[in-house]
Amino acid sequence: MIGAAESFEERLSVSSWDRRQGKLAVFGCIDEESGVFNREYLLFQLRENLSTFNRYRIPFSVLCIQVDQIDHFQSAHGIRAVDAIQHAVAQTLGNSLRPTDLLGRLSERTFLAVLTECKANEIESVAKRLTKMVSYTEIKWWGDKVSVTASFGGYCFGGGRHG
């Protein structure tokens, strides 16, 4: 299995994801709350992928990701817990993608993954793997370990839809 769920306790090593994010934070490309690419950078990269697809017909896919029942989670644990779990989910997703893929925060409650050279027949297995990784993600909140699930919808540029 590629990727890893995050349990946000002290980490000693810095992943390639963290190094890449650190470099781009200097240029204002990172969403401060989630630690992933911000909407502007995400949309820029999406336009670049569309341009490449139109020119060279290299397929790519996008996955729209939402944490399930976030309003219920907020009622039970508060807005700070929502921010913490969204950050944990974002880091888990980012660390579970290939180095050529990217993850960004599309809106307050939605992430978008751009999967390079991912064909229609591959997107479902990627979504299933990421769903599993998110389900293992947990945070400690007021002495409790809390976790969430996520829903995915996807589209492949080069043919096919999922979700």
What would you call each of these model-derived segments?
Residues 101-102, 137:
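Residue-level detector of beta-strand structural context in well-folded domains
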